[in-house]
Amino acid sequence: QKVFEWSWQIRPSQPLSAGLWNPVLTDLNVLQLENSDIITYHNYNGPEEHQTVIDSLRKYNRPLVCTEYMARRNNSLFTNIMPILKKENVGAINWGLVAGKSNTKYAWDEPIPDGSEPPLWFHEIFHPDGKPYKQEEVDLIKSLTLSK
């Protein structure tokens, strides 16, 4: 609460936001929602659950930005989440772009001690040489971001 109070006193030019990341932390979530200029949130669930979260956040009548999404093993995919975000006018940021920088092709809780290729990349879009992990994902991202 104090951080928001201090921030409101100096009123920075950028919007204030504290990202929602754990639905179990209800008191913290209420504080964040009531004090954020824009609502930022994480969601690594499939399309039905993600839509439910968007619907529940709409009641605050503030812009929404999903600051973390896309976890292939969780059925949170570019192909089923990005169209929802586009339709709902929700900003989107996903972890990982090129394999190797942040190593998020590996799931956080499934280490591969020898560093071998995971059977399914968790995040990441491109191999280090620039080749897409899945061309259809890159095509979808381009089509959704270039269309109005």
Task: Describe these PLM feature segments.
Residues P119-K148:
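A short C-terminal boundary segment appended to hydrolase-like catalytic domains
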